[in-house]
Amino acid sequence: KLGYTKESRQDLLCQIMDEAKVPRPVQAAVLEVVESVSFTTGTPCRPELQTESAIVCDADRLDAMGAIGIARTFAYGGAKGRPIFSPSTKENSLQHFEDKLLRLKDGMKTGEGRRLAQTRHAVLVQFVEEFKKEWNEENIELC
């Protein structure tokens, strides 16, 4: 997501599909599914694409969970200049866990997505608990 607009992502995706000789109707369906995935701005797909949309959505959300999701959260926060944690502002990477990551498990759309999300969600919960415990022990401001 960093460094790309919605339009530039779509252009890049179309270029890749053109090079792979993906037929235009399939390209349109892929773009529609991609647009349906966003956590905050997703738009519903046509009924005939809802299975594909559910699978891609779960895969995207699973990427944001677990150990890799934790790493991605702090990498993104660092790229945006956010502190790891600061009790004086909600503009910090740890807040993203409360705002979004810890809610992902309940939004899974497929049985397999729900199954995989259980373990990754537990990793997130354990990390946040341990982070807060250490923060309270150290009581330092991290940057």
Model-based region annotation:
Residues 13-16, 34, 124, 131:
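Hydrophobic alpha-helical packing residues
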